[in-house]
């Protein structure tokens, strides 16, 4: 298995910082207990800002990233997404696929319908069902507009957190000493914990959308459970240096158990996978890696 870790070049970091200033307008929908739009509510529309952000990202990607130029494999990737899309609640969103010439395990979805994979995903996923489970999860992120909702949540929490931190600094400056610094540090910790909580919620939503889409499209949702188990084993083996995908998509015991329970509830009609075709595409990816 090739090395499964990516160090992102400076242009990606710079682009991410620029994107941070593009806060999307939160949709006017019912919220759940976490203060986020309820599951399914966020899939009603894609804003112009999301389209612009996605196209800006795509221009940067095509100019800077090492692309895997393989039309045959890209056609295969598009066919898998086309099979999942009608069942993924993306409301006719036109998707664009990109492939990265990188041996690390990674897949991503960018606002506006850009779906990408690393060639290393083929190396890690042993069958078509496992590979599709990752695509279904990423389409779930697009369906629920997680980037837009995350930006909206950040806008809601950062100012209160900053106010609390400044208040703590004022206490310290006024002679409060340790108490003031503790208040300032506590506000920062609370903000980080809030972000982690919403990240876990987003992963659960994307899992649920993905599992249902797999079943409706004729894929065995248990393939996602198998993929999660394989990812969890990799994370444990690699310790402090897991691939970037597992840093942004951590597979916890709770997440694995939830996926197992959900998959067991789903029925698959007309199940079909083409592992022979997948094996051919996987071989092409392995040749490009080595």
What are these regions (language model features)?
Residues 2-108, 191-192, 234-237:
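Hydrophobic or amphipathic, alpha-helical segments that drive membrane association/targeting
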Residues 39-44, 55, 67, 75, ...:
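Extracytoplasmic and endomembrane cell-envelope/extracellular-matrix remodeling and assembly machinery
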Residues 64-74, 87-97, 147, 151-154, ...:
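Surface-exposed patches in mature extracellular/periplasmic domains of secreted proteins
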Residues 83-84, 88-126, 252, 256, ...:
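Signal peptide-directed extracytoplasmic domains
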Residues 116-133, 196, 201:
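Short pre-active-site segment immediately N-terminal to the catalytic Zn-binding motif
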Residues 117, 133-141, 145, 206:
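Active-site recognition of the HExxH zinc-binding catalytic motif
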Residues 129, 139-156, 174:
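Catalytic Zn2+-binding segment of zinc metalloproteases
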Residues 158-178, 182-192:
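Membrane-active amphipathic alpha-helices enriched in small hydrophobic residues
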